[in-house]
UniProtKB/Swiss-Prot annotation:
Pathway: Carbohydrate degradation; pentose phosphate pathway; D-ribose 5-phosphate from D-ribulose 5-phosphate (non-oxidative stage): step 1/1. It comes from Mannheimia succiniciproducens (strain KCTC 0769BP / MBEL55E). The keyword Chloroplast does not apply. Gene3D superfamilies: 3.30.70.260, 3.40.50.1360. InterPro entries: NagB/RpiA_transferase-like, Ribose5P_isomerase_typA_subgr, Ribose5P_isomerase_type_A. Its EC number is 5.3.1.6. Pfam families: Rib_5-P_isom_A (PF06026). Transmembrane segments: none annotated. One of its GO terms (molecular function) is ribose-5-phosphate isomerase activity. This is Ribose-5-phosphate isomerase A. Keywords: Isomerase. The active site is at E103 (proton acceptor). Catalyzes the reversible conversion of ribose-5-phosphate to ribulose 5-phosphate.
Amino acid sequence: MNQLEMKKVAAKAALQFVKPDMIVGVGSGSTVNCFIEELGAFRDQIKGAVAASKASEELLRKQGIEVFSANDVSSLDIYVDGADEINPQKMMIKGGGAALTREKIVSSLAKNFICIVDSSKQVDILGSTFPLPVEVIPMARSQVARKLVALGGSPEWREGVITDNGNVILDVHNFIIMNPIEMEKELNNVAGVVTNGIFALNAAHTVIVGTPDGAKIIE
């Protein structure tokens, strides 16, 4: 079973959490795209969805699912998203698709944050396999990069990428994140940082791992 097939296994398993009349929160990325395709079969049973990226909004509309703004809802029953890395405490690195800020906003509305991944995304320590994305106000890019170097990282500007919020992304290599909560707080306090891709303060509640043997659900 290849990686895409394992993503589809996880995406299909997440459908069991979708109930009638829900507004479903969805993130962004390749695994979420699989979920949105599956969610299309529920278009007449759910009220709609709140998406964390413009790309996901477009896919939802193609499936005939009504799209709501985060400002339209006070809470969500579920939020379904992928991750670039996830540790045993259900803390994640996200932001490979540059939608990390909106993902934090929408996921914070959810009673149940469901993370769907294939088994390659599971790590013991965050930062082991994937650089940490940091969304930065454009005028602060160099200043923030210097601060990240001082903290022990090796930031790389993701040239040509502009977020849905009009900002830029620095991908920080060589961060081995032993204390994700403290690191998330520290980086978010750097002037010019909008947010960083550590999801530790708002970790997942449920993890669904797609494996060759089927979906493994961790609650």
